[in-house]
């Protein structure tokens, strides 16, 4: 009987240390992208902040987005992404959602608390929440 009691106490202690399910950490509450069309140019004002929140380098996010849009662009000193071409905010948000699913979200626990790691020619998403390591398609 005492071993069963100890087991239950250890389980209770374990569950008390686990994070609450559905609780959102810092990276979970992502800012909305601020997108402007000026003439034939599209600007994303808070691009650098967004990339910082998802723990990805600006150039990796930019490379994915520009490749999908088939348009040239660059990040300026203020952290704004400037894309040559007129694109709707809906198109850009859809592409960023795809980027999140493919290169940020942990496939095991669905957390956005991950880092992108490159070993030789392989890319991996390493989850900081559950420790899973998932291979992804190279950029």
Curated annotation (Swiss-Prot):
Keywords: Initiation factor, Protein biosynthesis. Transmembrane segments: none annotated. SUPFAM superfamilies: Translation initiation factor 2 beta, aIF2beta, N-terminal domain, Zinc-binding domain of translation initiation factor 2 beta. InterPro entries: IF2/IF5, TIF2_bsu_arc, Transl_init_fac_IF2/IF5_dom, Transl_init_fac_IF2/IF5_N, Transl_init_fac_IF2/IF5_Zn-bd. It comes from the Archaea. Belongs to the eIF-2-beta/eIF-5 family. This is Translation initiation factor 2 subunit beta. It comes from Saccharolobus islandicus (strain L.S.2.15 / Lassen #1) (Sulfolobus islandicus).
